[in-house]
Amino acid sequence: MKIKRTQEIDQFFNRCLHNIQNESKNNFLGLVVSKETEKDIQKQMKKAGFFEFQGDSDKWPSLFISSNDYMNRPYHKTIKLEKIISDEFTYQTQMVNANELFSLSSIQFDPKRELNDSMRLVALDEPMEVTILYQHNEVWMLDVPSEAETIDPIAKKAYGNVLTFGLGIGYFPFMAMLNPNVKSITVIEKSKSVIELFNQSLKPQFPNNIPLTIIEGDAFDYWKEDVLAQYDSVFVDIWKSNDDGLDLIEKLLESYLPQYDKVDFWIESSCLEIMPTLILMYFESISRNKHAKTYDKDYQRILRKIDAYFKKNDQMIEDVNSLKDFMYDMKLHRKILSIKL
């Protein structure tokens, strides 16, 4: 692929590079907000580039979410984590302060597609007690609003025979069971201890309206075309955060690239947040007949995959929208990551 440097494309590159370097959004994490200061903070967030505050101020979303609404979600009303009895797993409760901004969802991609991607920051309207689960005295699972916010939409869109990788405290299977379009749920879980914990303490509290099957096994042993073909929708949740998510998603996709619409990866936009930036770096470099480079060895490997993909494309790109289409195509992100070098 070749890129013709035009004034429009140069200006686009400059805007993207400016957005990459703008870290002012991070300054709002943990900021204390009240009903009295909410509007002023929203104005500051607008100035920092949060795109949800760029339009008419009357339509700006509130910075507050209801603690009561979260605690009254079906899982929390039904499942009592204090019933967990295990020598290996323990739990503690901790109060989360109200009026402090935290990230609720996975990364939201810039509607203008110019790398002004951002977190959705909100605060609880009242203090809330959350559960922290430990395995061998190390934090294993946090029962916090962001977990529900990032899993509920996937449970609602699931249908037919569902396969999920990763059991945890069973939040996804529980919510998927409430979906009338789901016929059965199969879970692949590597840890025998997690399965025993679930079967002993949590499964008895679950509804039994549809079959729930738990298989002890490694995700990579079941991530195969013939296995996934037996299911209608697939959800993968085997990483702790976006820190290890990109690496695991890449390894899975190198093993097998499934149909895009059939599979959801937990917090995929956060795990793959770097992809639009790396593609932009590649485009900017080849427009100058240079090779894109980064000091991060993992990102450099992905740049090599990006190069391998676009080398097969003999297009001459002369417009910004074509570049944006490539940068923000999540189906393309998966395809690039699936390339074996």
What are these regions (language model features)?
Residues 179-180, 229, 255-259:
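Short, conserved loop/helix-junction motifs that constitute active-site signature segments
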Residues 142-203, 217:
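SAM cofactor-binding core of SAM-dependent methyltransferases
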Residues 175-176, 225-227, 248-252:
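A short acidic, amphipathic alpha-helical/loop segment
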Residues 191-233, 241-242:
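S-adenosyl-L-methionine
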Residues 240-340:
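C-terminal substrate-binding/active-site "lid" region of AdoMet-derived donor-dependent transferases
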